[in-house]
Amino acid sequence: MSQHPLRPAGSRPGDSPPDGSCPDGLAGGGSAVGGGGGGEAGPGAAGADDLVIAGRAYGSRLLIGTGKFASHRVMRDSLVASGATIVTVALRRVDIGRIGDGDVLDFIPPSMTLLPNTSGAVDAAEALRLARLGRAATGTGLVKLEVTPDPRTLAPDPLETLRAAELMVADGFTVLPYCSADPVLARRLEEVGCATVMPLGSWIGSNRGLRTRDAIEAIVASAGVPVVVDAGLGVPSDAAEAMEIGAAAVLVNTAIAVAADPARMARAFALATAAGRLGFLAGRGAAGPATVASASSPLTGFLGAHPSPASHPSPASPVPSVSRATSPAAVVGEASR
């Protein structure tokens, strides 16, 4: 099991239990459809349907954030429960002087891949500066690019995001940009060399769900890199919906962190993400017209072929008696007792 860069060897505060256990048996196991995979195999061990970013395989299609948790230990338990293999952390929250002595990084299981983010950056220059600090502190060239100058909506600035992406790619970073759900911008980000595009589902931290579905479907249809739906997913069914329309992965933070039981919610999101992916791979059947039903079972010929006219008793023939014990009414009566 690899150690985070700059993290001293040995036991430290917040390390996950040696057996990988999690409260209430919520640990997220691996899955061929991305429902977990945060165990010893770790990123890079290719599976049947792994998420692949910049040529590297990850066993879970659920990415998870680290903000807003009540404590570092609650965060750690939720990370383990999620089964995620990629965890994002705001570079502004990392205290380089305290790494190994209670910093947030010390509570992230070492098997997880760190994805530093530039949360709080208001322009391309600041985002690049934060990314370089993160690379120096963590040793990773992965970066989740965020440029959000509007404090009210935290909407990504499309011009500064594209400019920052160009600068970061030129500087050797593997860039995963948070962006508006704009198919044209997504294509431009891919063209400058971003490893993914990460369109928002709704405003950051809003828990309002997938409000940009049509635009994300358009992005998925033309993207040549993984599409990761980021921001606003509020309940597990939102994650399932994003995966069902073809997203490669989802990133969730607030919905898990502010839940009454964060670890259990993390596991729920893992299962929903896996279910949505499996549903996408299975292929949805064509939707029928809104005003016409289509029976899933035949409406005639139950229990065999149609009886011939000769099998019906003639009016002159006595109708066979049916004993109470075998009459439909008797059967219903017996069953209801």
From Swiss-Prot:
Key words of the record: Cytoplasm, Schiff base, Thiamine biosynthesis, Transferase
Main location: cytoplasm
Localization (cell): Cytoplasm
Listed pathway(s): Cofactor biosynthesis; thiamine diphosphate biosynthesis
Swiss-Prot/TrEMBL GO biological process terms: thiamine diphosphate biosynthetic process
Enzyme Commission (EC) number: 2.8.1.10
Active site: 144 (schiff-base intermediate with dxp)
Biased composition (Low complexity): 10-25, 319-337
Region (Disordered): 1-41, 302-337
Pfam family, one: ThiG
Source domain of life: Bacteria
Family: Belongs to the ThiG family.
Quaternary assembly: Homotetramer. Forms heterodimers with either ThiH or ThiS.
Function summary: Catalyzes the rearrangement of 1-deoxy-D-xylulose 5-phosphate (DXP) to produce the thiazole phosphate moiety of thiamine. Sulfur is provided by the thiocarboxylate moiety of the carrier protein ThiS. In vitro, sulfur can be provided by H(2)S.
Name by which UniProt lists this protein: Thiazole synthase
